[in-house]
Structure formats: C-alpha cells, structure tokens
C-alpha cells in the first residue's frame, strides 16, 4: 500500500506544479513588466553599440580643435558648446541637430573635470569656502533645468533661421557685457598693483613682523569652514526631481516607465508638471533666509571688496532677476547644447561676483544643465552615442590641462581678469562661427526650396 501511495503523491505534485506556475506570473506580472520596461528604457548599451562615425582626417582634426576649445573654455567655466557645435558641423561634417547632441556630451565631460577641481579649491576672500557659490547655484538651477527642457523642444520646433538669429542676438549682448567687465577688472587689478607697490616701499621691518603675526591668525580663522553638503543635497534632489519627470514622460516613441501615447495629453501633462515644480523650488529658495550667506571676510578690506559688497547688496535686492536669466540661459543650452554658461557668466560678473567664483559657479551649474540636456537627447533617440562619449573624454582631459595652466598664470601674475577675457574670446568666436554657419544653412534651405517654417515636436 505504501509503494502505491508514493507514486500517487508524486503524480499529484507534478499535476499541481503547472497550475502554481501559471498563477505566479499573474501575481508577479505587474512588477516584472515595470522592471522590464524600466530596464529596456534605460538600456543605453544598445545605443552605445550603434555604428560609430568613421575615423577620418576630418574627425581627427575635429578632436584636436575640440581639445583646444575645451582647454580655453574651461578657464571661464562656460562649457564651450558655442565652439563645439561649429567644430562638429564645419570640420566633422555632422548636421546641426547631431552636432548639438554631441556638444551636450562634450560640455558634460569638460564640466565634470571643472567641478572636480573646483570642489577642492578654497577661496581666501570668503573665509576659506569653496570657489563654488552654492547659494547662487540653488537660486539659478531650477529655472535653468526648466529652460533646458523648453530648449530641447524648441530645437525640434523652431526653424534654423530663427534659432540662428536668437543665438546671435543673445550671444552678442553677452559678449559686450563680458568684455566690459573684463576691462573693469583689469583696471581694478592695475590699481591694486600700484597700491601694493606703494605700500611695499613704505613698509618697514616692524610692519613686516606684524603682518607675519596676522597671517597665522587668518589661517586659523578660515579652517573651520565645512563643505555645504546640505546645499549640494538639495541641488541633487532638484536634479532627480526633473529626471523623474523625464522617466515618467518617456521619449518620442512612447517608450517609458508607463505606457502613454507619444505627444498625447498625458505626455504634455507630465511635461508641464515641470512648471509648478520650478515655481516651488524657486520661491522656496528665494524667500528662505538659509540661502543667504556672507561671502566677504572681515580681514580682507580693499577697493575691490567695497565694490563687491555694494554689487552683492544690489544683487540680493534684485534676486528675482536671476531665475529669469537662468531660464533664458537654459533654453539656449537646450537648443544649442552650450550648457547655458555663456549667459550666466556675464550676469554674475555684472553684479560684482569675482571672476574665479563666477567661473567655478558657472561650471557647476553647467554640469547640471548639460547632463540633463545629454540625457534628454538620449531619450529622444540620439545616434552615435559611443563616438559622442569619446569626444566627451577628450574634453574632460583638455579641461584639466586648461585649468592647471590658467591657475598657474593667475598665481604668477595676479590677473584674474584673464578668466573674463577668455570667456569673451570664446563668445566672440562662437558668434562668428555659429552665425556664419547658420546663415549658410538658411541660405541653402532657401535656395533648395525646403520648408523653413515651424515644425511639430513629434
């Protein structure tokens, strides 16, 4: 009886197993589908395995020019997208939209190197804090990220003639402001050099001893400054909030975490949710007393410090202007892949922020906006991602080289205005190259009879 009972139990288990197996997928199906959709949507390995651009002479020349452009642009922390786009279009022979997506990757690579270096550099004029002004970054970043989203859509909708015209107008204004600020800082530095020389002649041995006693006290006063991890965490939360919106929305093919119709009502509803998100973060930061910090040190009183104090007080009274400018900068960054630093940098210089702090803060903000722009290009079906990553590595190395050279020059000659002039030179070259190429592109469209009006984003 026992021998007959064992086969009956085994046959019952075998019969029951398929029914259990059929029930398990019904329980795990929603979770499995969500995980599969997320993994397939974020599976960039297939994009990186796309056929790369052939290694030709023009590609090598484009890489060398990109290295030179990144090393120059890294001094001002502006990203260099205004130079990358003409290089990739004129030299490498890419179309404007592909060049813009490449530029977003290249700006990201250079910004990573910039931020990595500036995080460990202390500003002696602000009590030993980092060169990056996290208060300004908090105030500007939400609107800049919203502008990037708008700019990417505008890149698909606007005709080439309108994009070229807007770029030329805004960049011309920024260039004039930058060179004006550069001349101002140059004259101010010249006056400070004369003051130091006159003081050096009048100093006697007793004053030298007093100064030698003061310096250790200053160093001890600056040491307790700690890294603002909370502010950095808030910036990361802001970035992740916008990234979550992009994951929910999906790309133009309707591929995302949730299944929605491409360019349907749900698509635009999720996209428009960035507006209240931006308003929430911006208003909270604007009216929060915690975002204000005293940047000046009581031990550094000079003509330049008085001017900076006066300018910073005016900037705080008109701080609502910063989000508007950040929005415009983000729009241009999304359209051209320039990171937005070319407009933010003249703004910060205009209100009296030191060139070193301006460059460091701009590179930090450009990192956030350029990574968001690069991710959006990926989600919109960007091609040749592997080649774009190679150019990003080139810009990363070039930025490290450029930063070291500029820091050595500033330390030796004491001319921080070199940073401002480098920004102006990059802007001027960008205007000439981008406007010339854009005008030729518009002329070719006109001669060939192509459609030169607005297009649908999808």
Swiss-Prot record:
Annotated membrane topology: Multi-pass membrane protein
Q: The organism sits in which domain of life?
A: Eukaryota
Give the primary localization class. membrane
Q: Where in the cell is it found?
A: Membrane
The terms describing its cellular component in GO are: membrane
InterPro entries, per the entry:
TM_pro_TauE-like
Q: Does the keyword Transport apply?
A: yes
What the record says about family reads:
Belongs to the 4-toluene sulfonate uptake permease (TSUP) (TC 2.A.102) family.
Q: What is this protein called?
A: Sulfite exporter TauE/SafE family protein 2
- Supply the source organism for this entry: Arabidopsis thaliana (Mouse-ear cress)
The taxonomic lineage of its organism, from the top, reads: Eukaryota, Viridiplantae, Streptophyta, Embryophyta, Tracheophyta
